[in-house]
Amino acid sequence: MSKGRLFTSESVTEGHPDKICDAISDSVLDSLLAQDPRSRVAVETLVTTGQVHVVGEVTTSAKEAFADITNTVRHRILEVGYDSSDKGFDGTTCGVNIGIGAQSPDIAQGVDTAHETRVEGAGDPLDLQGAGDQGLMFGYAIKDTPELMPLPIALAHRLARRLTEVRKNGVLDYLRPDGKTQVTVQYDGVTPVRLDTVVLSTQHAEGIDLEGTLTPDIREKVVNTVLSDLNHDSMDTSDFRLLVNPTGKFVLGGPMGDAGLTGRKIIVDTYGGWARHGGGAFSGKDPSKVDRSAAYAMRWVAKNVVAAGLADRVEVQVAYAIGKAAPVGLFVETFGTETVDPAKIEKAITEVFDLRPGAIVRDLDLLRPIYAPTAAYGHFGRTDIDLPWERTDKADALKTAV
C-alpha cells in the first residue's frame, strides 16, 4: 500500500430503502425461528412507493408466525420510523404483498442428508447436514480498532448509528429515517494516519436550512460526538472535510425516493471493501445457508486468530459444495503480519474450528431469532449488540494448537 493512500468505506441507516428490505427479511426470519428453530427460510423483499413485496421459499411448522407475516412487515417498517406519508412511507397504510412458496425438495435432500451420509456412509451426526449451496465465504480481522475491524467501515457504522440515535431520541427531531455515511481515511502503509473526509447525507423535514441548521447540528451532535469517543492512537481527526447533504435538500427519501431490495448492501454488511467478499448476501436466510452461517464462522475464525496474537491482520476463505458437509477448501492469508508459520496457523484453525455447517450452527447457536438487529450497521464488529461470532473464545485454543 503506497504512502498517502486514501481508502473509503460507507454505511447506511436502517431507513435506507435497501436496509428496510434487509430488516423486513430478517424480521420474517426471526419470527419463524422463534416458533420453529428448524425453519428453512429464504425471503427476499422489495419496497417501492407505497408497496412492499415479500417473496421466497419457506418450509416451517411455525404456522402462526407464517400467517402473521404481514403484521411482522408492518411492525418493522414502523419501528424503523416510517409512520407517515410525509416521510415517504407509512407502515400502517402501505400495501403488503406476500408471495412465498416451499423450499425446493431437490435442495432440501442435500441439506437434510449430506453426501457424506448418503453416499459415503458416514456415521457422524454432524455429517448429516450438507451445505445449502456451493459458494465461497471470507472472514477478516485487523488490529485497527478494539473490535478488530478496518477503521473506515467501523467509523462509518458509528456515524450511521449515531445519526439514527439523534433522530429517534429527539435530539434532532427534524431528521427522517433515510441516510448514508461515508468515511475517507489517509493511510501510511496500512496504518490509518488522518481522517480526510466525512460525507453524511440525511433525509430531513421540509424547510430545514442546510447551512444554518443541518450542517452545524450534524457536526456537533453526530460527527464530533462519534469522534470524541473514537480515541484512535494513530489517526489525526483535527482537520477533515465534512460534506453534509452535498446535493442540497433531502426531503424525498425512503422507498418514495428509491426502490429497495434485500441483499444490495453486502459491502456495507461486511468489511467496507477492505477485505474480499464471496458475493452472497445474508438477510432473509436461515443458517442452513452457508452464505450466511459460514461468513459468520469465518469472521469468528479471523477474529480469534488476531486476538490470539498469531497475526495483526488475517483473511480466511472457506468454500463448500452443495449437499456436502465438509468444506472443499480453506485459505488463510496473513499479509506478512504473522508471528508464527502461516502453515501452522492454518493447521490450528482446522484443529480448533469444525467448519461443517451443522457444527457451525451448533457452536454459534444460530437456530435463534438473533438476526433482525444485524440488518443495519453491519454484521461484524458490532459494539452495541452481543453476537456469538464476535467472541474471542477460541483464542487460547489457537495459541495452544500452534
From Swiss-Prot:
Q: In which pathway does it act?
A: Amino-acid biosynthesis; S-adenosyl-L-methionine biosynthesis; S-adenosyl-L-methionine from L-methionine: step 1/1
Pfam families named in the record: S-AdoMet_synt_C (PF02773), S-AdoMet_synt_M (PF02772), S-AdoMet_synt_N (PF00438)
Which residues does the record give as K(+) binding sites?
44
Which amino acid positions bind ATP, per UniProt? 16, 178-180, 249-250, 258, 264-265, 281, 285
The record, for InterPro entries, names:
ADOMET_SYNTHASE_CS, S-AdoMet_synt_C, S-AdoMet_synt_central, S-AdoMet_synt_N, S-AdoMet_synthetase, S-AdoMet_synthetase_sfam
Entry cofactors: Mg(2+); K(+)
Q: Which reaction does it catalyse?
A: L-methionine + ATP + H2O = S-adenosyl-L-methionine + phosphate + diphosphate
Q: Where does Mg(2+) bind?
A: 18
Where is it mostly found? cytoplasm
Q: Which UniProt keywords apply?
A: ATP-binding, Cytoplasm, Magnesium, Metal-binding, Nucleotide-binding, One-carbon metabolism, Potassium, Transferase
Q: What general EC class does the enzyme of this chain belong to?
A: transferase
Keyword presence, Ubl conjugation: no
Q: How is the cofactor bound?
A: Binds 2 divalent ions per subunit.
Checking CDD domains in the record gives: S-AdoMet_synt
Q: Which PROSITE patterns match?
A: ADOMET_SYNTHASE_1 (PS00376), ADOMET_SYNTHASE_2 (PS00377)
The residues that hold L-methionine are: 57, 103, 258, 289
Q: What does this protein do?
A: Catalyzes the formation of S-adenosylmethionine (AdoMet) from methionine and ATP. The overall synthetic reaction is composed of two sequential steps, AdoMet formation and the subsequent tripolyphosphate hydrolysis which occurs prior to release of AdoMet from the enzyme.
Which HAMAP family does UniProt cross-reference here?
S_AdoMet_synth1
**PANTHER family linked:** S-ADENOSYLMETHIONINE SYNTHETASE
Q: What protein family does this chain belong to?
A: Belongs to the AdoMet synthase family.
Cross-referenced NCBIfam families: metK
The protein, known as: S-adenosylmethionine synthase
Q: Which organism is it from?
A: Mycobacterium sp. (strain KMS)
